[in-house]
């Protein structure tokens, strides 16, 4: 599911590279990259189906959250919404849900029980959000050789990430000095 979501994300972001190599959409075009992502989603679903109906439902809810997060990111926050809270919810839905599900699957399949699965799911979501924040900082602060991606992709695509949102918040409050710090 994660790899499939990356194929789709690269189409949405018009990203030419992923992990230091040309992205699927760059190599094959948008239509083929989307279809390849769909095939990967289907294969992941087949694997999860062998785990039983409870896991299939959990996987489906994760896929739904992932898509809702992408839609919300695409549409942006409603008027008056806190943009940082909105951003963090998008991260929780897109990246956090995937890590959360992987963690809860591990707990459930190891026999740890639903209480422990819930605890590791919550932790996994936080890890996913933290990972995405770090990735967003790298998009601004690292070279393509370091990150394996084209720097500044989010800025070019008009996606407000946490560093940009916090800078705008400071600008609105008048707390940025002449050097921009």
Task: Describe each PLM feature range.
Residues 1-177:
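Mg2+-dependent prenyl diphosphate-binding active-site environment of isoprenoid biosynthetic enzymes
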């Amino acid at each position: 599911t994660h790899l499939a979501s990356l194929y789709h994300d690269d189409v949405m972001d018009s990203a030419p590279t992923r992990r230091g190599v040309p992205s699927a959409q760059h190599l094959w075009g948008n239509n083929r990259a989307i279809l390849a992502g769909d095939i990967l989603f289907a294969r992941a679903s087949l694997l999860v189906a062998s785990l039983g109906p409870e896991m299939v439902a959990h996987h489906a809810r994760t896929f739904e959250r992932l898509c809702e997060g992408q839609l919300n990111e695409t549409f942006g926050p409603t008027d008056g919404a806190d943009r940082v809270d909105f951003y963090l919810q998008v991260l929780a839905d897109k990246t956090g849900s995937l890590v959360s599900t992987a963690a809860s699957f591990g707990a459930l399949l190891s026999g740890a029980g639903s209480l422990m699965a819930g605890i590791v799911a919550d932790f996994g979501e936080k890890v996913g959000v933290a990972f995405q924040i770090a990735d967003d900082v790298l998009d601004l602060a690292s070279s393509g050789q370091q990150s394996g991606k084209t720097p500044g992709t989010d800025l070019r695509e008009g996606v407000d990430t946490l560093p940009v949102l916090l800078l705008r918040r400071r600008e609105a409050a008048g707390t940025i000095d002449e050097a921009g710090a």
